[in-house]
Amino acid sequence: MSKVATMPSTTLGRFWRKWRFHLNILLVIIPLAFMPKYFHQVALFRGDSGLGEREVGEVQVGPWSLRLAELFEEPPRLEGPAGYMKSFNAALCAACLDEVKATYLRIGKPRSLRAAGAIFFGSPYRMGASVPIPVRTKADAELWITMEGWDGSMHQASIPLAQASPATLTWLNRQGVKP
């Protein structure tokens, strides 16, 4: 009969054998703490909870209109070299679905269609755009919406930034106007 040589157990080995079940349970439970935030974002991205966290309302742009909403009701996020960005969602009116070619969003009045701002992407029922927020933006700035029709017509409207995103205005006031 052969004798089996066993190595003496170490403190770490004894600890692992005693607590491995509990540690594995923790590995399962810890991700559950993040589930409410995950389900909130899934409902937001899927559209179950509306266009965004904060609905701005209906904005009339020439003969057309759109519903505008902040995706997240929070200050702009730093997106690396692009700077601070703020995300908005929009939905075109039922009457203008076939008439609107493109919709743009920008802080400050656009000089021309070439500088119209960030283009909305997605279906006309739920479009999204991320607008760069310059640090030097003044508190009385306006958010300009430019809509281009298939017939070549272009219409613009503006709403105060304070109405479109109070969180961004608070963030700008905290930053202070820089020269």
Language model: regions and residue ranges:
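N-terminal Lys/Arg-rich, disordered targeting/topogenic segments
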Residues: 1-15
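Hydrophobic membrane-insertion alpha-helices, especially the h-region
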Residues: 14-39
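Transition segment at domain starts
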Residues: 41-85, 116-120
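Extracytoplasmic/periplasmic copper-protein system
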Residues: 54-58, 161-179
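Extracytoplasmic/periplasmic/luminal assembly and interaction segments
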Residues: 67-113
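Non-transmembrane interaction and regulatory regions of membrane-associated proteins
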Residues: 86-89, 101, 114, 120-125, ...
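Short, solvent-exposed, Trp/other aromatic-anchored flexible loops in extracytoplasmic proteins
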Residues: 120-144, 150
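Short acidic/polar inter-strand loop motif in beta-rich domains
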Residues: 149-156
